């Protein structure tokens, strides 16, 4: 199958632009497909909530790498979180995928809110860290043709520092997404 996978140039943009533009895109992971409904940006050395605020470490090295790579980490001893690296190589930034509408074939679509819940349901773990999502048909984000105009920006949640930044993007009306169907057809590039 060929998919209209987002390219490195998409992720190399400013993180806030990427976080906004990811709304309505399709996350593909193995056989799962979900429309992205919630994101959060984490930007650079000066963002106190970003892992990169502590500098370059083994854990954060992927954030300093090429845009479009997955950054998956483990928090609170129980949850994995999926991010995609943004901005040009060398500038540490990523966008957290906080929520999707999971598209199902023979049953109603499921709204998944929360990055830990998302990774648990899709079975995304640390073994999926540092994967080039611009070259992997089993783990990527694709264009859908869906333009999201109804969204809100809020402060980021679930963090203790940097809460004042309105860097969380949330689709405000999920009604139309609940009726989308799973597509098993080939996408044009």
UniProtKB/Swiss-Prot annotation:
It holds the Pfam family Pur_DNA_glyco. Its EC number is 3.2.2.-. The keyword Transmembrane helix does not apply. GO terms for biological process: base-excision repair. It comes from the Bacteria. GO terms for molecular function: alkylbase DNA N-glycosylase activity; DNA binding. This is Putative 3-methyladenine DNA glycosylase.
């Amino acid at each position: 199958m060929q998919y209209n996978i987002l390219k490195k140039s998409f992720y190399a943009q400013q993180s806030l632009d990427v976080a906004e533009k990811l709304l309505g895109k399709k996350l593909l992971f193995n056989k799962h497909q979900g429309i992205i409904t919630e994101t959060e940006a984490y930007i650079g050395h000066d963002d106190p909530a970003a892992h990169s605020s502590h500098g370059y470490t083994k854990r954060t090295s992927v954030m300093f790498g090429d845009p479009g790579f997955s950054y998956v980490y483990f928090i609170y001893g129980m949850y994995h979180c999926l991010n995609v690296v943004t901005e040009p190589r060398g500038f540490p930034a990523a966008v957290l995928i906080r929520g999707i509408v999971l598209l199902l074939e023979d049953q109603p679509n499921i709204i998944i809110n929360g990055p830990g819940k998302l990774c648990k349901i899709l079975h995304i773990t640390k073994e999926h860290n540092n994967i080039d999502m611009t070259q992997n048909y089993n783990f990527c984000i694709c264009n859908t043709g869906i333009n999201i105009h109804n969204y809100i920006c809020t402060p980021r949640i679930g963090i203790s520092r940097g809460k004042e930044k309105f860097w969380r993007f949330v689709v405000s009306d999920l009604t139309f997404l609940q009726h989308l169907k799973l597509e098993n057809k080939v996408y044009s590039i």
